[in-house]
């Protein structure tokens, strides 16, 4: 059995009117987990809790077998936060100097290989970068200190498709080492279709599902039916539903639906929309 790179058990944190409620999931080494949910669902808060940037009110978080505040563990985590980054007056040369002091395993040669690959002018101030260039710089930094776990908060948000594919290629290369793992928060579900092994869905601070992606897509589907047909199903077969004037549609478990009923394939985006906007049928 593979070791877990990340474990969360019963994590709770209250922020005024928002709260993480009993958040729990495990991320094995050798795995890319997509963390999905609408804006404000708790994705960034969860990542900050893993990084020990905020302290949960209760619960337990284990990172690479230890507590996330352990300095030796922090050395092994590569981080890209959506609204994070380096001072805008700095350039890539200064970023290299800064991070060379911060990380024992900082690899200057590796960092500048990424800078060259990305076509970044190492003397240019970050304030003059495009959004895509800033993201590439942050990812280059995350990949240049021998990290084992990447925590990425919306790393492809706002990027054009070509740059997004380039970023995903880098993550794919990182995962060639089966000791590595990635937690990737994103609302761009097409990216997760390409790279994610597992999907964790968080809604209003609560994890509604955490399952292997292929298993989720293979076992679930969309059923369009009448209200009477929906009522005839075992409730355990219906994960979420929408009831309208002219009929119903439901996110269902295929093995709980009669074989002669047409169940359409489903993708990650549709699952997220059903669980966010549909009526919970648990």
What residue spans do the PLM features occupy?
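Exposed alpha-helical structural elements
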Residues: 110-113, 229-232, 267, 271
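Short, surface-exposed beta-strand/loop "edge" segments at domain boundaries and coil↔beta transitions
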Residues: 150-155, 229-233, 256-260
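ABC transporter nucleotide-binding domain
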Residues: 168-252
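Residues that form generic nucleotide/phosphate-binding pockets
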Residues: 114-117, 170, 219, 271-275
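Short loop/turn segments at beta->alpha junctions
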Residues: 91, 212, 264-267
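ABC transporter nucleotide-binding domains
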Residues: 3-183, 189-190, 194-203
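C-terminal coupling/interaction segments
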Residues: 238-282
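Non-catalytic surface loops within mature trypsin-like serine protease
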Residues: 29, 227, 254-256
């Amino acid at each position: 059995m593979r070791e877990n790179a990340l474990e969360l058990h019963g994590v709770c944190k209250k922020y005024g009117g928002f709260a993480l409620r009993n958040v729990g999931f495990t991320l094995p080494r050798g795995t890319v987990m997509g963390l999905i949910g609408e804006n404000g669902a708790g994705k960034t808060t969860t990542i900050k809790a893993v990084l020990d940037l905020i302290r949960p009110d209760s619960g337990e978080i284990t990172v690479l077998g230890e507590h996330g505040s352990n300095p030796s563990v922090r050395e092994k985590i590569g981080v890209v936060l959506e609204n994070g980054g380096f001072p805008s007056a700095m350039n890539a040369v200064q970023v290299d100097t800064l991070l060379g002091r911060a990380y024992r395993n900082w690899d200057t040669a590796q960092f500048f290989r990424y800078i060259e690959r990305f076509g970044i002018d190492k003397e240019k101030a970050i304030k003059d970068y495009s959004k895509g260039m800033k993201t590439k710089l942050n990812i280059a930094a995350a990949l240049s200190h021998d990290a084992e776990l990447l925590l990425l908060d919306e790393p492809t948000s706002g990027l054009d498709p070509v740059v997004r594919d380039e970023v995903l290629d880098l993550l794919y290369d990182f995962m060639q080492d089966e000791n590595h793992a990635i937690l990737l928060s994103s609302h761009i579900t097409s990216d997760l279709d390409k790279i994610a092994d597992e999907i964790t869905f968080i809604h209003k601070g609560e994890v509604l599902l955490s399952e292997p992606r292929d298993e989720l897509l293979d076992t679930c589907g969309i059923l369009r039916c009448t209200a009477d047909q929906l009522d005839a199903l075992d409730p355990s077969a219906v994960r979420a539903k929408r009831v309208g004037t002219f009929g119903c549609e439901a996110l269902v478990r295929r093995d709980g639906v009669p074989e002669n009923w047409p169940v359409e394939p489903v993708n990650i985006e549709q699952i997220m929309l059903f669980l966010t906007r549909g009526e919970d049928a648990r």
